[in-house]
Structures are given as structure tokens and as C-alpha cells.
């Protein structure tokens, strides 16, 4: 029953994406506190822009996600008909891909704060170097546009992940998991804004990744099991329950207890094991081999990613790129004016000054 009301992957996906959105907001607010007096009208105006921009991006994402889920469960849910096992298997394998990608992102969450400091600093520098009439109009609302675009992008990414994971699950298992994920992500963002650090939550994110991979491995086994079940139904020419529920020649075990699909008082614990660990009272060679191969793939990929990131860090250090987020934001201060607007370099003036260096020197001397 519990797996029908709370979907674990949905919770962790929204928790991770909400955490990233909250970090974006907290980094911008911290930057404004460094730049301006917190009692000044400029600070209050820009702070409101940050909150409104982030809220607008989040609202649009929630609307898109709700529309997707509503369309799926009201229009598309009954399309597969007699091919339900095939669709269940395909949806499970799609969810495996989505959850695996989210697990990899979860492992990098502790570095998310530094990443967004550097990203936002680069965005400010880019706005400073590019001049256009459209950009000039947006200067007054730059601190609305930055959180709006970044939160919208992260939110749409969450919609894509949830779309892949939610296929084949019951709609009533989404709301509670989604709400709890958003609340927990906002709480983490608030703690970071108040002076915390994601590094202190490292082991929590590692634990979350392990849970996600356990779920994904279980879904891999269940997906293969659904496809095998469909093949068995084709052999016997009907529903397996009418003859025998499994192919004996490919079964590794089949026990009468521990059935997660049984509707009785003792099935609650087995339903939890089924949702998190992929437990089933019937196992086949295909489901067990796919389960083991999934873990082998994950372990090999994590080792590969570790050495890849290590080499990338060495290249960044040799190139002298920003590595410290606070240093990047400190450098970005020069691109913000006293009124909170982005300073746009006038390239034409610079070119004219380069063509007439003597006049520029005399002009600077007069100003001095």
C-alpha cells in the first residue's frame, strides 16, 4: 500500500532539483548582500526581483509538470490494452535510465554551490561584454531574468525526469512524494543561505544516491520480468493466471509467500521491498542477470567518472580557470553598477579610444 501513496524516485528527483533551484536563489541573495547595504532601496528592489524571478520559473514548471501528468493519466493511460506487460517493461527500463542519470547528478550535489557561483559570475561577465538594445532594456531586471531562466531550466529538467519515471506508476503515488521533495529541497536551500554548506550533507547525498540505484536496479529486474512475462503469455495463449503464472524452465525461484501484488494484511512489507529493492516472489535468469549487470555498469561508470573529473580538474588548474566560487563572485562585482544594473561595455568607445590614444590620455588627464 505504501508504494501506491509514495514514490521514492519522484521524491529524490524533486528534492535534488529543488535543492539546485534553492541554491541559485541563495547564491544571488548572498551576492546582493555583499554588494549593497541591506537597508538600501536598491538591495530591496533587487532582492524582490530574485524572489519573483525564481517563483515565476518554478510556477511555470509546476504547470507544465501538472499538465503532463494530467494528460497522461486521463488520455494515454489505457492505450496499451492487451500489451500491458510490454508497456510496463518498457516504462520500467526508461525509468532506469532516468533514475541512473539523476543518481549521478545527486553525487555531484555537494559541489553544486560552487558550480552556480562560478556560472552566475560568468553570466554577469557575458552580459557585460555583449551589448544590444534588448539587453539594455533587460538591465533593470537582470536579477529577475537570471533566477527565472535558471530555475525554469532546472524545473523543465525535473519534468523530463519525472515524465520518464512516472510512466507505469499509479498517479496517487506522485503528489505526496512531490510535495515532500519540494519542501525538503527548500529547507536545504534555506540552511545553505543561513551559512551552511553542502559538504556537510555529503553523506546524505551519497545515501540518497544508493537508494536511487537500489530502486533503479530493482526496476531493471522488474522491466525484464515484465517482458519475459509477456513472452510467456504469448506461449500459453492467454493470461498466465489462467494456466501457470511463470515459465518453470527459466525460473530461479518461485515462492508462495512474499508476493508484493497480493492484497492482504501481510503484503505491506513486501510492497516496500518491491518498490525499493525490486523484490518479487518469482525470479528468472533474465531478471537476476540484468540486476547484476546493472550494478556492474554503475560501478564501472563511477570509476570512469572519477578519473575523468580528476583529469578535468588538472586541466582547469593549468588553464587558470575559476575554481573558487567566492573568488568568482568577488570578480563579478565590477560588472554591477551602484543602481544594481549590469554595466555594459561600450565597444565603439573602446575602438575610438584605441584609434586616438593621444586624445584619450589628454581626456583622462583633464578628468583627473
Curated annotation (Swiss-Prot):
Passive immunization with anti-ftr1 immune sera protects DKA mice from infection. Thus, ftr1 is a virulence factor and anti-ftr1 passive immunotherapy deserves further evaluation as a strategy to improve outcomes of deadly mucormycosis. Signal peptide: none annotated. Its main location: membrane. One of its GO terms (cellular component) is high-affinity iron permease complex. It is a multi-pass membrane protein. Residues 346-368 are annotated as: Disordered. It comes from the Eukaryota. One of its GO terms (biological process) is reductive iron assimilation. Induction: Expressed in iron-depleted conditions and repressed in iron-replete media. Induced during infection in diabetic ketoacidosis (DKA) mice. One of its GO terms (molecular function) is high-affinity ferrous iron transmembrane transporter activity. High affinity iron permease required for iron uptake in iron-depleted environments. Required for full virulence in mice. Belongs to the oxidase-dependent Fe transporter (OFeT) (TC 9.A.10.1) family. PANTHER family: IRON TRANSPORTER FTH1, PLASMA MEMBRANE IRON PERMEASE. This is High affinity iron permease 1. It comes from Rhizopus delemar (strain RA 99-880 / ATCC MYA-4621 / FGSC 9543 / NRRL 43880). The gene is ftr1.
Amino acid at each position: 500500500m505504501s508504494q501506491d501513496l509514495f514514490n521514492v524516485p519522484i521524491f529524490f528527483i524533486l528534492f535534488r532539483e529543488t535543492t539546485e533551484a534553492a541554491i541559485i536563489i541563495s547564491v544571488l541573495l548572498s551576492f546582493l548582500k555583499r554588494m549593497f547595504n541591506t537597508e538600501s532601496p536598491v538591495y530591496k528592489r533587487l532582492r524582490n526581483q530574485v524572489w519573483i524571478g525564481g517563483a515565476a520559473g518554478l510556477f511555470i514548471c509546476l504547470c507544465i509538470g501538472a499538465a503532463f501528468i494530467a494528460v497522461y493519466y486521463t488520455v494515454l493511460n489505457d492505450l496499451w490494452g492487451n500489451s500491458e506487460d510490454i508497456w510496463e517493461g518498457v516504462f520500467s527500463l526508461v525509468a532506469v535510465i532516468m533514475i541512473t542519470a539523476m543518481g549521478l547528478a545527486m553525487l555531484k550535489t555537494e559541489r553544486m554551490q560552487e558550480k552556480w557561483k562560478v556560472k552566475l559570475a560568468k553570466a554577469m561577465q557575458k552580459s557585460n561584454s555583449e551589448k544590444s538594445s534588448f539587453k539594455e532594456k533587460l538591465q533593470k531586471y537582470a536579477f529577475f531574468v537570471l533566477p527565472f531562466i535558471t530555475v525554469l531550466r532546472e524545473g523543465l529538467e525535473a519534468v523530463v525526469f519525472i515524465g520518464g519515471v512516472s510512466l507505469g506508476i499509479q498517479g496517487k503515488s506522485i503528489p505526496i512524494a512531490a510535495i515532500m521533495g519540494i519542501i525538503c529541497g527548500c529547507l536545504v536551500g534555506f540552511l545553505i543561505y543561513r551559512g551552511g554548506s553542502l559538504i556537510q550533507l555529503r553523506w546524505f547525498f551519497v545515501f540518497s544516491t544508493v537508494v536511487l540505484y537500489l530502486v533503479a536496479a530493482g526496476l531493471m529486474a522488474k522491466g525484464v520480468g515484465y517482458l519475459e512475462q509477456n513472452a510467456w503469455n504469448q506461449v500459453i495463449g492467454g493470461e498466465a493466471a489462467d494456466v501457470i503464472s511463470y515459465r518453470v524452465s527459466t525460473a530461479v525461484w518461485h515462492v508462495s509467500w512474499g508476493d508484493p501484488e497480493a492484497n492482504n494484511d501481510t503484503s505491506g512489507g513486501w510492497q516496500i521491498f518491491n518498490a525499493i529493492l525490486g523484490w518479487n516472489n518469482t525470479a528468472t535468469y533474465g531478471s537476476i542477470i540484468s540486476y547484476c549487470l546493472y550494478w556492474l555498469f554503475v560501478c564501472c561508470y563511477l570509476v570512469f567518472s572519477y578519473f575523468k573529473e580528476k583529469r578535468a580538474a588538472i586541466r582547469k588548474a593549468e588553464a587558470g580557470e575559476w575554481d573558487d566560487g567566492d573568488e568568482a563572485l568577488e570578480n563579478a562585482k565590477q560588472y554591477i553598477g551602484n543602481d544594481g544594473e549590469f554595466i555594459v561595455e561600450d565597444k565603439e568607445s573602446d575602438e575610438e579610444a584605441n584609434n586616438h590614444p593621444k586624445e584619450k590620455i589628454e581626456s583622462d588627464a583633464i578628468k583627473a
